[in-house]
Amino acid sequence: MTHPIFMVGARGCGKTTVGHQLAQALGYDFVDTDLFMQQTTNMTVADVVAQEGWHGFRQRESLALQQVASNRCIVATGGGMVLAEANRRFMHDKGIVIYLHADAELLAQRLEENPQDNQRPTLTGRPIAEEMADVLAAREALYRGAAHHVIDASQTPDAIVVSVLKALRLSAA
């Protein structure tokens, strides 16, 4: 197995944490699309959104996805990467898509516990628990539709990595 592995899911589901660990376990490279955009634009996600709006950010996000996708690479995507049908198709066709699924309450709890990880501006301006419930309601079908494997992200990062590795082994058999 050498195809890229794309991690999708809402903010706080563990894409970056699990992606790093999975890359180490597999001997793959690791790239986070948000971090890649920050490095290539010299702007934070919030700055890009402030200057170019969400539409401009989503365009940059799609370009970043195409630039970083390579064999033997784990790609942690932004939570909204699945909003563009072209991104879903690209990930599904080019690699293996892992959806890290967690409920809105757990996502909100994680984001509140680690506010430094919450670099992306709020989508709605409402409390994070309400926003995460709305985001999941709008995106759940997109995440599942793009995914080759759905993994329970309420586990510890180590347990999630084990679950992903098991799913990858089963699909390769």
UniProtKB/Swiss-Prot annotation:
Documented EC number(s): 2.7.1.71
Gene3D superfamilies tied to this protein: P-loop containing nucleotide triphosphate hydrolases
Record: residues binding ATP: 12-17, 120, 155
Pathway where this protein functions: Metabolic intermediate biosynthesis; chorismate biosynthesis; chorismate from D-erythrose 4-phosphate and phosphoenolpyruvate: step 5/7
First-level EC class: transferase
Region feature LID domain, mapped onto this chain: 112-126
Cofactor: Mg(2+)
GO terms (BP aspect): amino acid biosynthetic process; aromatic amino acid family biosynthetic process; chorismate biosynthetic process
Residues that, per the record, bind Mg(2+): 16, 32
Subcellular location: Cytoplasm
Reactions the enzyme catalyzes: shikimate + ATP = 3-phosphoshikimate + ADP + H(+)
Positions that bind substrate: 34, 58, 79, 139
Self-association state and partner proteins as the record states: Monomer.
Role according to the record: Catalyzes the specific phosphorylation of the 3-hydroxyl group of shikimic acid using ATP as a cosubstrate.
NCBIfam families listed in its UniProt record: PRK03731.1
Protein name: Shikimate kinase 2
Organism: Pectobacterium atrosepticum (strain SCRI 1043 / ATCC BAA-672)
Originating gene: aroL
